[in-house]
């Protein structure tokens, strides 16, 4: 019990010291229970003596104003993403490119924390803005919530403008405790610590963020006026301002030292306080960083050396069959829950029944499960030595699990051929509204599920007949949300032709193939198999899939095209092409150019060229920038015309 103002001031100082050890040094002096008791006594004293409350009291570090929305906010300097390397050879190649030009370069290595990147802007020593990475140029403004992250300083002993960047995470221990609380409260569990950190930082009610025990680990700076010579000095300076130091950070001179630290970190991975997915490698010398520069997306002076996929053993307790938009049946194993890289895995794909037979996977088998890239659960193999007689064969179904239509069993895949199967229709609509198709904002999986359950839609055409009163029947839909969705659906009309083709969800036809098809105009889907085969990059499977899809859905396609009226600006214009050297030519771009490759690709496509991603004997021109790599060697082998950027610009001016 605090009895005097002197004891009150001493308690503030003591609690701030405890917080520093817990969040910054990761060396807690007392248990959480003891801290909470001391904190509550402080709070009780302040309630009785409000005139004595100090600004540096732990109870006053943040406000608790609920947010109505997150505004977009630009970063003063771009927040880049890192290129990944996945093995010894890729790392060696990355290092050689740097060390060949800069033999004296050294490298700072540190754990790659799997959290949410955050940019803190300080001006005159005060935290002014906290912004998520977003698209790298701008993110969401979460300043109020960031002030609830215990080891984000509200003030720093540095008056110049500076952006301090780092990762917002939740420790494995706090994550498990949070999920335990949610389980007891019958609330949905977070899938992994990163999701928990992201969801906690973006709460509309900042009081919830405060309860989540988020931490901030700095890994760099954005805009600044520091005069340091090395990246390591920058990190040390950030720590001197009161921020947490990065554990297991090291300075390395060569490939051998980097690999040694990488393997040490892998050994520490399970014991590390937070979730890791790799090791970040950054050139230490800032002058070399400046000279190396950036690609369109990433710095050339840094990379993320990803960890190998983790594997665990568990048991298959059941199998369910999912139906995709093409009608393909995908068997999914139901597993005894197992934790891999911080996520509880209860399902894993079995891909198809041919693979089940090939791997001899049985029900009740103990199996090896991995999360490839720490994301996608897969079953690698059964552990046959564990079989005890309870195992039984996984039977290939004969009818669709959704519509009971007889299935077509091919050598590898099994298909539901019923075009009106509700599962196929739902998956088709989810794809139709997806980012690389018509990109209908607000029309996600759950909304489409509801629309089907309410029998409001059966295909894409029905979307455009929806009314406000229809959407008001859906769960959690009010007038504003319903109107926003209707507006988004109407906005999807008049799409680029390639988007509409991609939205159809034709088997074997993705985004790239859709763009190629769009060049041939609005009636491209009416072409014959032979005509499709003449197109760059189209094989027999793709051609037959297009012909069969159009034959089965001709009336639907025509109605959809009439309703949406796609733009046909991608059609090749013969007059425009005729005067260009690039007309009707197949062109590949490689290496680093002064402009983004996509910008040059668009210019060349407008002149009638066909842009390809791979070099072959059919390639007419290879446009090369710096670090052209294997495509240059292949082009020389095939006798392809090779142009550098200067020569390309010369031809474009003609």
Swiss-Prot record:
One of its GO terms (biological process) is DNA replication. GO terms for cellular component: cytosol. Keywords: DNA damage, DNA repair, DNA replication, Ligase, Magnesium, Manganese, Metal-binding, NAD, Zinc. SMART domains: BRCT, HhH1, LIGANc. Disulfide bonds: none annotated. NAD(+) binds at residues 32-36, 81-82, 133, 167, 306. HAMAP family: DNA_ligase_A. This is DNA ligase. It comes from Helicobacter acinonychis (strain Sheeba). The gene is ligA.
């Amino acid at each position: 019990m605090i009895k005097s103002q002197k004891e009150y001031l001493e308690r503030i100082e003591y609690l701030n010291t405890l917080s520093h050890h817990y969040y910054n040094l990761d060396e807690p002096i007392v248990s959480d229970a003891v801290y909470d008791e001391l904190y509550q006594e402080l709070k009780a004293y302040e309630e009785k003596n409000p005139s004595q409350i100090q600004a540096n009291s732990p109870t006053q570090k943040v406000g608790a104003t609920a947010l109505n929305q997150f505004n977009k906010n630009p970063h003063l300097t771009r927040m880049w993403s890192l290129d990944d390397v996945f093995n010894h050879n890729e790392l060696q190649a990355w290092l050689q490119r740097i060390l060949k030009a800069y033999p004296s370069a050294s490298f700072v290595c540190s754990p790659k924390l799997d959290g949410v990147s955050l940019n803190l802007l300080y001006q005159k020593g005060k935290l002014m803005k906290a912004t998520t990475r977003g698209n790298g140029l701008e993110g969401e403004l979460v300043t109020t919530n960031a002030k609830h992250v215990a080891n984000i300083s509200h003030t720093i002993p540095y008056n110049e403008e500076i952006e301090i960047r780092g990762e917002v995470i939740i420790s494995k221990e706090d994550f498990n405790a949070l999920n335990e609380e949610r389980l007891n409260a019958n609330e949905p569990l977070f899938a992994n610590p990163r999701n928990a950190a992201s969801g906690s930082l973006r709460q509309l009610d900042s009081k919830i963020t405060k309860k989540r025990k988020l931490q901030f680990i700095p890994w760099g700076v954005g805009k600044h006026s520091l005069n340091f010579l090395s990246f390591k000095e920058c990190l040390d300076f950030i720590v001197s301002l009161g921020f947490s130091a990065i554990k297991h950070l090291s300075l390395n001179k060569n490939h051998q030292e980097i690999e040694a630290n990488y393997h040490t970190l892998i050994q520490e991975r399970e014991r590390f306080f937070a979730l890791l997915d790799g090791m970040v490698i950054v050139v230490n010398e800032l002058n070399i960083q400046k000279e190396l520069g950036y690609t369109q997306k990433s710095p050339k002076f840094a990379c993320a050396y990803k960890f190998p996929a983790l594997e665990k053993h568990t048991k298959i307790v059941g199998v369910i069959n999912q139906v995709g938009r093409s009608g393909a049946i995908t068997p999914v194993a139901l597993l005894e829950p197992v934790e891999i890289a911080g996520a509880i895995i209860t399902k894993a794909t079995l891909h198809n029944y041919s693979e089940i037979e090939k791997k001899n996977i049985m029900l009740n088998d103990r199996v090896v499960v991995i999360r490839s890239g720490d994301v996608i659960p897969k079953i690698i193999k059964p552990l046959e030595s564990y079989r005890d007689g309870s195992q039984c064969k996984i039977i290939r179904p004969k009818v669709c699990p959704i519509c009971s239509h007889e299935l077509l069993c091919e050598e590898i895949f099994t298909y539901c051929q019923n075009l009106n199967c509700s599962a196929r229709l739902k998956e088709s609509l989810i794809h139709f509204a997806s980012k690389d198709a018509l990109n209908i904002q607000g029309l996600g999986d759950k909304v489409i599920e509801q629309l089907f359950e309410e029998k409001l839609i059966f295909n894409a055409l029905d979307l455009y007949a929806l009314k406000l009163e229809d959407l008001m029947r859906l769960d959690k839909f009010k007038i504003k949300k319903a109107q926003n969705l209707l507006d988004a659906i109407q906005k999807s009309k008049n799409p680029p032709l390639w988007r509409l083709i991609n939205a159809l969800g034709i088997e074997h036809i993705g985004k790239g193939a859709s763009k190629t098809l769009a060049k041939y105009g609005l009636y491209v889907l009416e072409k014959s198999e032979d005509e499709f085969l003449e197109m760059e990059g189209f094989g027999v499977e793709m051609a037959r899939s297009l012909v069969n899809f159009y034959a089965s859905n001709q009336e639907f396609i025509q109605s959809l095209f009439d309703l949406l009226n796609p733009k046909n600006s991608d059609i090749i214009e013969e007059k425009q092409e005729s005067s260009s050297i690039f007309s009707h030519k197949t062109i590949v771009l490689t290496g680093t150019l002064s402009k983004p490759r996509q910008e040059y690709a668009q210019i060349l496509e407008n002149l009638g060229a066909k842009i390809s991603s791979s070099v072959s004997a059919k390639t007419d021109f290879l446009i090369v920038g710096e670090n052209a790599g294997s495509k240059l060697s292949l082009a020389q082998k095939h006798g392809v015309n090779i142009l550098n950027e200067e020569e390309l610009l010369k031809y474009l001016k003609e």
